[in-house]
């Protein structure tokens, strides 16, 4: 009989989808095992016969499915306002250029976010965070990028820090100051990049407000030379980097990111084979964002077969934002990734667990159920992991465990 220590907690009578690639079964499934949790981490996975059937801190899950906590590795969670009226205009035939000329597009969100005080901005973001937590998310990336000036970018990152301090969900904050050119720099995007590189990145990094730097390398964002200035600045300070690349066109952003050992290349609908090979060589995760693909009614799909062939890890995320993916649901993104991009349910599960953890630099502690990893996991009223992907309108979450505590 396995000896338990005071304070140990056990989950028994479970079907365990570990997502551990070292296990041979699909999803890393094991049966007739129990989880021992100690001090917020997974202490061990042992045969049920080695443990008492009942006792203090022993939870009988009656055969329910247990998976790692979900990880949403790409969100724009902190913003004010919405773009519903603009979406209706687009559906009625208005062009993006026409909407932008009227003050719409990303700068509409920037204006609303700049004008919003920190407390109401926090309350808006907190409600969104809790929606994701209710789906089983235990680690969440939050980007800035709707300030495009030092004060508001800092405000967005302070909101992310306040959310993290609630200890309800892990937050990975990202500085996305190079998201778009603000209206006041419309005729001087290089000048804006200078502001980002010489002021925003070093000052906000010194304050400890973010974990990584992101950018938007695209024809409607920043060109390759401007993007490389951002990457050079970040790398000189030892800051991990990532990027929105190859979403609307092929500029070579994925190859650029990979030269800087980017954590992830996100969107990647127009990614080519040279970019895929560079991502493999640079250890860069491909993050698929099917919500934006759907909402923008795009036609160019990411090169999933190439990513498989080159064995590039693929993550899936919600990309929750007001302009191109207003879906605060990782479950929906999981389903869309299967239906629209052709991922298998097992690939999607890897994409919201171990590969998503890698996209955030957390692969040594998150995204799998194995000894030594954080005790972040979800108990589902389900028998198979595919059930959560198959029916996105139904949430079979039974219990969410964060840092070893039922939450």
Swiss-Prot record:
The keyword Flavoprotein does not apply. The gene is hutI. It comes from Salmonella agona (strain SL483). Belongs to the metallo-dependent hydrolases superfamily. HutI family. Binds 1 zinc or iron ion per subunit. This is Imidazolonepropionase. 4-imidazolone-5-propanoate binds at residues 83, 146, 179, 247, 324. Its EC number is 3.5.2.7. Fe(3+) binds at residues 74, 76, 244, 319. Zn(2+) binds at residues 74, 76, 244, 319. It catalyses: 4-imidazolone-5-propanoate + H2O = N-formimidoyl-L-glutamate. GO terms for cellular component: cytoplasm. Its cofactor is Zn(2+); Fe(3+). Pathway: Amino-acid degradation; L-histidine degradation into L-glutamate; N-formimidoyl-L-glutamate from L-histidine: step 3/3. N-formimidoyl-L-glutamate binds at residues 146, 321, 323. One of its GO terms (biological process) is L-histidine catabolic process to glutamate and formate.
